[in-house]
Amino acid sequence: MSNKNKSYDYVIIGGGSAGSVLGNRLSEDKDKEVLVLEAGRSDYFWDLFIQMPAALMFPSGNKFYDWIYSTDEEPHMGGRKVAHARGKVLGGSSSINGMIYQRGNPMDYEGWAEPEGMETWDFAHCLPYFKKLEKTYGAAPYDKFRGHDGPIKLKRGPATNPLFQSFFDAGVEAGYHKTPDVNGFRQEGFGPFDSQVHRGRRMSASRAYLHPAMKRKNLTVETRAFVTEIHYEGRRATGVTYKKNGKLHTIDANEVILSGGAFNTPQLLQLSGIGDSEFLKSKGIEPRVHLPGVGENFEDHLEVYIQHKCKEPVSLQPSLDIKRMPFIGLQWIFTRTGAAASNHFEGGGFVRSNNEVDYPNLMFHFLPIAVRYDGQKAAVAHGYQVHVGPMYSNSRGSLKIKSKDPFEKPSIRFNYLSTEEDKKEWVEAIRVARNILSQKAMDPFNGGEISPGPEVQTDEEILDWVRRDGETALHPSCSAKMGPASDPMAVVDPLTMKVHGMENLRVVDASAMPRTTNGNIHAPVLMLAEKAADIIRGRKPLEPQYIDYYKHGVHDENEGAIEVKPYAK
């Protein structure tokens, strides 16, 4: 049925992580008509590749779930094109990601708040919104850092496989600490991770926010609805046109909110004449607002896997045997338990790569299995691996449309490894990871390094390996960043979430982040959307909560850490 001439108070372009939050929160006002337009299909309850946590590797690269983006040839990665999976389904990338929940370090948000006009995005103002969205089963009811009644149900990784405990102990032996909660008082250290898995199923943003709200009469959700154009009268957005089932539909809107993510949002802005004027003219597009920051400041996390052979038969490697998969799948279908009921990213840590760094700049994900994200397993009977990479690369990329065609994918480049600081941190990251994996606590299991292998030792050999094997951690952000109007590269007003120079066009998604955070970015995107919902609705914001958190050089180095007995063989 065509929605031609139908009018909505809010049209949200994108039913991903941020769009799901907004669809729920904005439709709480019963007198407001809300439309969510998702270009992908529905996240069906019966779809095992979405709902089964351990099936997370299957949607990537599959056109039914993934937009299958790729960068242009990366000039500092040997000319490689780096594949980028983005969710083409309700829930967006929260329906195909690794389900890891990490807020980032509190100092990330202190950095957000440094520019004039960004003061309400410091940690004290963001913390109440993190708590609002969380239901943290792994935290004590009195834990003032964590939320206990939110829609996102979080499972604390049990990390019962002996490889996890040995890895945590190895971190302590290497001179680091163990922390009870990387989202609590102390991020720095090693310990279990929270995951967006509830009762053995993926807890996506759409499952948590959008599906419970769909019974409301004032909320409409359209899937397979690809927005081709935003309509304007001067500086005011008046509606959108979208294509569904081969037909074009035009609807009117009092407000248009872009929640398409770090790729689609800057693409739509540029197609709408919002961006660098000279570049837009070169593509035959009449400039509407000159905002040279659209598509710039692009950030991402790059990562590699350091893989080891495991001497003891304790890893999950046998679960990759195709003969065992039917049993594992049936166990999950009937009981929601077993190897398929976990994302297996149950623990890891955050450390500083050197003593000059104020707070952690390296992230580790540990897996009791040796396998690539595409499902390619190492040729060993048993293995394990650690994912590692710098969190604050100062390399910056860009996204630029290639033409006026909304269906043509844009030109994407992240410029990985383009700075000396970036390369320095990468060498440190690999050396820190190897040091941890070589500690005595790992001796009972350490059967030797598979990848990159002992032949990779010098700084240049390490960088060559990263250039060959580095993959995106799938955390693109900051391509339409928040910032005051005095910042020539800012795109979004941090007080209103409106695009600078526009009256009723807003951006709420990862593209609006001013800087990436230390960790997986799904939790920060949910927080940003929760906070933005109050801004858009004109509600009084939640009261800031000024709570002390661990700072290196300020607190005792052991404060908030768990005492671990030294490993004794």
UniProtKB/Swiss-Prot annotation:
E.C. number(s) listed in UniProt: 1.1.99.1, 1.2.1.8
Pathway: Amine and polyamine biosynthesis; betaine biosynthesis via choline pathway; betaine aldehyde from choline (cytochrome c reductase route): step 1/1
GO biological process: one example: glycine betaine biosynthetic process from choline
UniProt-annotated binding residues for FAD: 9-38
Catalytic EC class: oxidoreductase
Keyword list, A-Z: FAD, Flavoprotein, NAD, Oxidoreductase
Catalysed reaction equations from the record: choline + A = betaine aldehyde + AH2; betaine aldehyde + NAD(+) + H2O = glycine betaine + NADH + 2 H(+)
Domain of life of the native organism: Bacteria
InterPro entries documented for this protein: BetA (IPR011533), FAD/NAD-bd_sf (IPR036188), GMC_OxRdtase (IPR012132), GMC_OxRdtase_N (IPR000172), GMC_OxRtase_C (IPR007867)
Cofactor(s), names only, from the UniProt record: FAD
Annotated Gene3D superfamilies: FAD/NAD(P)-binding domain, Glucose Oxidase, domain 3
PANTHER family: CHOLINE DEHYDROGENASE, MITOCHONDRIAL, GLUCOSE-METHANOL-CHOLINE GMC OXIDOREDUCTASE
Entry function: Involved in the biosynthesis of the osmoprotectant glycine betaine. Catalyzes the oxidation of choline to betaine aldehyde and betaine aldehyde to glycine betaine at the same rate.
HAMAP family according to UniProt: Choline_dehydrogen (MF_00750)
Name used for this protein in its record: Oxygen-dependent choline dehydrogenase
Organism: Staphylococcus aureus (strain Mu3 / ATCC 700698)
